[in-house]
């Protein structure tokens, strides 16, 4: 079961990815996590990626594809995997085909921009542990402090409203064509395509996914 999740940053893909992983026992391959790992490790790729991400720009295809190819070859991907944040462009989608990766399901999470901005600009992160909070949906017990350590929470650079808006512009201009691409693939019988309303309650979206993937 090889699955692609499509949707803007903050559309709820990460939450539903957890549900799919737990339900079906396949790993999530998140380019965001891979990139943050590379940035934390201070690799050349990480340094290049950080500069671009801080400016709200996308990381170029060749850097991402090399990360993804390496990851899907690992043993835990034998039964399938979940791609989150990749592909983002038609060349990336073509690159998946070129390296022989057949996608079974494409799941699009549809959420209006204004909802995304509210969701993302409210995120707060405990840097050392990666624990994430939200001022509206999942607030810490003490405002601005981590529940476990009491240390300060930060706003990641890519969660600031102006950066979120920049990322949404980039998303709409580069990733929206993927919707057409994969809908055409679905019509040709090469994959299955489903659009989900990402503004619904988490449990409702999970239930829909359960039905689709069962």
Swiss-Prot record:
Q: Where does AMP bind?
A: 31, 36, 57-59, 85-88, 92, 156, 167
What name is this protein filed under?
Adenylate kinase
Query: Can you name a GO cellular component term?
Result: cytoplasm
Q: Where is this region: NMP?
A: 30-59
Tell me the segments the record calls region LID: 122-159
Question: What broad class describes the main subcellular location of this protein?
Answer: cytoplasm
Repeat as a keyword of this entry, yes or no, is: no
Q: In which pathway does it act?
A: Purine metabolism; AMP biosynthesis via salvage pathway; AMP from ADP: step 1/1
What Enzyme Commission number does this protein have?
A: 2.7.4.3
> Which keywords does this chain's UniProt record carry?
ATP-binding, Cytoplasm, Kinase, Nucleotide biosynthesis, Nucleotide-binding, Transferase
List the gene name: adk
Q: What exactly does this protein do?
A: Catalyzes the reversible transfer of the terminal phosphate group between ATP and AMP. Plays an important role in cellular energy homeostasis and in adenine nucleotide metabolism.
> Can you provide one Gene Ontology molecular function annotated for this UniProt record?
ATP binding
Biological process, per Gene Ontology: AMP salvage
Q: What protein family does this chain belong to?
A: Belongs to the adenylate kinase family.
Q: Which reaction does it catalyse?
A: AMP + ATP = 2 ADP
Q: Which InterPro entries match?
A: Adenyl_kin_sub, Adenylat/UMP-CMP_kin, Adenylat_kinase_CS, Adenylate_kinase_lid-dom, P-loop_NTPase
Q: Where in the cell is it found?
A: Cytoplasm
| Residue sites binding ATP per the record | 10-15, 123, 132-133, 200
Write down the species.
Pasteurella multocida (strain Pm70)
UniProt free text on domains: Consists of three domains, a large central CORE domain and two small peripheral domains, NMPbind and LID, which undergo movements during catalysis. The LID domain closes over the site of phosphoryl transfer upon ATP binding. Assembling and dissambling the active center during each catalytic cycle provides an effective means to prevent ATP hydrolysis.
Q: How does it assemble?
A: Monomer.
């Amino acid at each position: 079961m090889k699955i692609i999740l499509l949707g803007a940053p903050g559309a709820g893909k990460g939450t539903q990815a957890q549900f799919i992983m737990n339900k079906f026992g396949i790993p999530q391959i998140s380019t965001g996590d891979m990139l943050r790992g590379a940035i934390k490790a201070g690799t050349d790729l990480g340094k290049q990626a950080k500069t671009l991400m801080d400016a709200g720009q996308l990381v170029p295809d060749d850097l991402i594809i090399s990360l993804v190819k390496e990851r899907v070859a690992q043993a835990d991907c034998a039964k399938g995997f979940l791609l989150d944040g990749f592909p983002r462009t038609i060349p990336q989608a073509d690159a998946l085909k070129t390296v022989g990766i057949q996608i079974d399901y494409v799941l699009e999470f549809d959420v209006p921009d204004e909802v995304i901005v509210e969701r993302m600009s409210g995120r707060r992160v405990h840097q050392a542990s990666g624990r994430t909070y939200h001022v509206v949906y999942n607030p810490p017990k003490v405002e601005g402090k981590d529940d476990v350590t009491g240390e300060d929470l930060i706003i990641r650079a890519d969660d600031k409203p102006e950066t979120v808006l920049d990322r949404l512009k980039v998303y709409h201009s580069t990733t929206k064509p993927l919707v057409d691409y994969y809908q055409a693939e679905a019509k040709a019988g090469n994959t299955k395509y489903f659009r989900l309303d990402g503004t619904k309650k988490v449990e409702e979206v999970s239930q829909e996914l359960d039905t689709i993937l069962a």
